[in-house]
Structures are given as C-alpha cells and as structure tokens.
Curated annotation (Swiss-Prot):
This is ATP-dependent Clp protease ATP-binding subunit ClpX. ATP binds at P117, T118, G119, S120, G121, K122, T123, L124. Component of the ClpX-ClpP complex. Forms a hexameric ring that, in the presence of ATP, binds to fourteen ClpP subunits assembled into a disk-like structure with a central cavity, resembling the structure of eukaryotic proteasomes. Coiled coil: none annotated. CDD domains: RecA-like_ClpX. GO terms for molecular function: ATP binding; ATP hydrolysis activity; ATP-dependent protein folding chaperone; protein dimerization activity; unfolded protein binding; zinc ion binding. One of its GO terms (cellular component) is HslUV protease complex. Zn(2+) binds at C12, C15, C34, C37. The gene is clpX. Belongs to the ClpX chaperone family. It comes from the Bacteria. The lineage of its organism: Bacteria, Bacillati, Bacillota, Clostridia, Eubacteriales. One of its GO terms (biological process) is cell division.
Length: 431
C-alpha cells in the first residue's frame, strides 16, 4: 500500500522517500514507485538477464560443420586446419558446459598449436573463431615476453589484454580465446638444457605453463611489472582457450630427418628438399619434432591439438583477393563506389598480384601492401577528376606500374583513356 504522512503527502511504497525528495513518482493502483527504485529494479533485472543470456550463449555452441562453414566465408583453403580447429573449439566449449552441469568425468583442455608459413591464415582463423563464438579475443606476441624479473612483459599481461577485450567482465573473459603469435620464437636455443639463463626462450615457456593448464592468475590492472603495493585482478584461466601460432621455420628439416631414417638403403626414394612441399611435410609432424625444435616437454604436453597449414598457391591467393566477404578487391571496389566510380580488375591483373605475393614470399599478408602500391596514384587522382565512370586495373598496371585505364562519361558519351595525358584516347559509344 502507498504511504502517506500526516499531510497526506505521497511517498514511494518501496523506499519511503517523499515526492519532493525524488525526481519522479509513478502511481499505480494503490502504490507509488520513485525513479530511483525503478532504476534499481532495472539494474537487478539486467544482471539476471545477462547471466541467463551468457548461459544460453554458452550452451548454444555451433556444430563443427557449422563452424567450418562460417570459416569458409572468410578463410580460403586450409580445409584440414579448419576441420581440426572446428572440432577442437567445439570440444573445448562442450567441456566448459560439462563443468557447468557437473560431471563425473574430468575433461582436459584442448589448447591448440598452429604451424604454418607467414601469411597462411593463422591469425585470421583465430580471429574468425572468436567472432563466430561471440567470446572475448586477444592477440599477444610471444617475442615481447620475458621471465619475471627481466626487462620485457610478464606473461600475465596477455591475460590483461583479454580482460580489456571483455570490458573488464572477468566472468566473460574466463571463457575467451587468446592467440599467442610467434610462439616458435620462444623455443630454447638448443635441445640440451644450457647453463646460461634463457629468459626469452625456455624461461617464458616455463612461465606460460600454469596459465595454459589452468590457474588463478593475479593480473596487474594497469599492466607492466608487478609490485607489492598494487591491487591485482584475479582470473581463472581453466576455461580460456589458448591458440599458439608460429611459422616454425626449419622444422620441416627435423621432420624430414626423422622420416628419412626409416627410408634408408638402395631401394629408398630420395626426394630433393627443394622439390618437397613444406605443407605436405608438416602433415607428418609429431610432438617429438616440436621438442627437437626447442619447445620443452611440459609446454608441448599442454598443447595437445597440433594443426598444420600449408603455403598458399596462386589459385588460393586469387580466391583470397576476390571471394571472401572481406576480400581486398571487394574492399577497394567499395571505396571507389563511395566516389561513384566503378573499379574493375582484369583477371590477368589479379593473377599478377598473386604472383608478386608468391615472389615476395609474404603469402596473403603481403597482398594488401602490393595493392596499396598499385592503387596509390589512382586513389590520389580520381577523387579530383570529374565525370570518371570506371577505372580498370590491367596486368601492365601490376607488373610495369603503367597507369590504369579510366572511362570518362561526358554528355552521355564514354571516352576510354589512360590516366596520363600522353596516352591515346579511344572514343566509345555510350551504352
């Protein structure tokens, strides 16, 4: 019931504040509620809704085939790697659900290590996985990490990036994904333990062990080194999925040496290392090859899922340029469309861009740099030119840096001419 004082003044039925003490008093059948109580109720309902929604999201895990189907929209090729990642991620979040529901069987973490050359799609795969699952995602560089007490970053700073990605929602961060790039750079310098301290190699591997396995870590909220007079954020890493990626240059020789020992004698087929496909060799990788490369046994044991990626050939690079939702050609066409200009790439031009990337050995990562070189002048000139209808990138534009061809539309007549004034002008009938 509503409350009244002696002067019959209206009061909130919940907190007892008078009409003068609050901004707004909402009346109902025999009851009143103030704006402050409404706000408090809204916060309580929102918190409960967030918890329910988080549980629903966690339970609604896409099937491995559905995960791969979405990965196919953004990442070209690497089918085996996508299948392995889809299964590993699906099993990881099923494991979290089993912990929520309670189970007799304890499921171990399925952290992942990805091996593949530069520009083969390791980082993009990890980013796309996080987007599919709608979980916080952070990328860390293993080369910046050092052992505690030395100049560099502590391993706990990796967790801080994930917490920041989750807007400091610790519960949400504890179900996120962390991608550690350049993991091969923290391999110890030799297979045998050394007397000298390896603070950026084996020391970092030792420091990462507990986080990978699952522990309650203390993270400095501002980053940097720990000191005793600061507060820490506590985060449980048990349900965080770690994906470690690296090029692992030279590991194919270790694999070849191991396989080669089994094929000795007069009848053995000897294949030149140059002719051998690195991607095919990596398919034969075993944990012992990672040990030989310089990862410590305990570290390899915490990365049970090994995923290999192969170098991208010309056909794959052409598809990357044109097919995915975020394809570079589509992005540039959209930019030109904003200036009301049609951008067209000839088939031979796209193939020439792919050939340049292979020649530079940069993989898909180098495609953007090549396109920027080609498109710089035309993106500078065209916005200032009037009546430009179409811009055509040719093979010569890519290989010889010949200016692209533009079609000018004046008085319903299209005139095709190269951008430079010395080139010939060809009149075309209006379509």
């Amino acid at each position: 019931m509503s409350r009244y004082d002696e002067k019959k003044q209206l009061k909130c039925s919940f907190c007892g504040k008078t009409q003068e003490q609050v901004k707004r008093l909402v009346a109902g059948p025999g009851v009143y509620i103030c704006d402050e109580c409404i706000e408090l109720c809204s916060e309580i309902i929102e918190e409960e809704f967030e918890e329910t929604r988080a549980d629903a999201e966690l339970n609604d895990i896409p099937k491995p085939s559905e995960i791969k189907e979405i990965l196919d929209q953004y990442v070209v090729g690497q089918d085996t790697a996508k299948k392995a990642l889809a299964v590993a991620v699906y099993n990881h979040y099923k494991r979290i659900n089993s912990d929520v529901k309670g189970s007799d069987v304890e499921l171990q973490k399925s952290n992942i290590v990805m091996l593949g050359p530069t520009g083969s799609g390791k980082t993009l795969l990890a980013q796309t996985l996080a987007r599919i699952l709608n979980v916080p995602f952070a990328i860390a560089d293993a080369t910046s990490l050092t052992e505690a007490g030395y100049v560099g970053e502590d391993v706990e700073n990796i967790l801080l990036k994930l917490i920041q990605a989750a807007d400091y929602d610790i519960e949400r961060a504890e179900k996120g994904i962390i991608y550690i790039d350049e993991i091969d750079k923290i391999a110890r310098k030799s297979e045998n333990p050394s007397i000298t301290r390896d603070v950026s190699g084996e020391g970092v591997q030792q420091a990462l062990l507990k986080i990978l396995e699952g522990t309650i870590a203390s993270v400095p909220p501002q980053g940097g080194r720990k000191h005793p007079h600061q507060e820490f954020i506590q985060i449980d890493t048990t349900n965080i999925l770690f994906i470690c990626g690296g090029a692992f240059d030279g590991i194919e020789k270790i694999i070849q040496n191991r396989i080669g020992k089994k094929s000795m004698g007069f009848g053995a087929k000897i294949e030149s290392p140059k002719k051998a496909n690195v991607g095919e060799i990596l398919k034969n990788i075993l944990p012992q090859d990672l040990l030989k490369f310089g990862l410590i046994p305990e570290f390899v044991g915490r990365l049970p899922v090994i995923v290999t990626l192969h170098s991208l050939d010309r056909e794959a690079l052409v598809k990357i340029l044109t097919e995915p939702k975020n394809a570079l050609v589509k992005q540039y066409q959209k930019l030109f469309e904003m200036d009301d200009v049609i951008l067209e790439f000839e088939k031979e031009a796209i193939e020439a861009i792919a050939d340049k990337a292979i020649e530079r050995n940069t993989g898909a990562r180098g495609l953007r740099a090549i396109l920027e070189e080609i498109m710089l002048d035309v993106m500078y000139d065209i916005p200032s030119q009037e009546n430009v209808e179409k811009c055509i990138i040719t093979k010569d534009t890519v290989e010889k840096m010949v200016p692209p061809t533009v079609i000018i539309n004046e008085n319903k007549k299209s005139v095709k001419k190269p951008i430079n004034k010395k080139s010939r002008v060809k009149k075309e009938s209006a379509s």
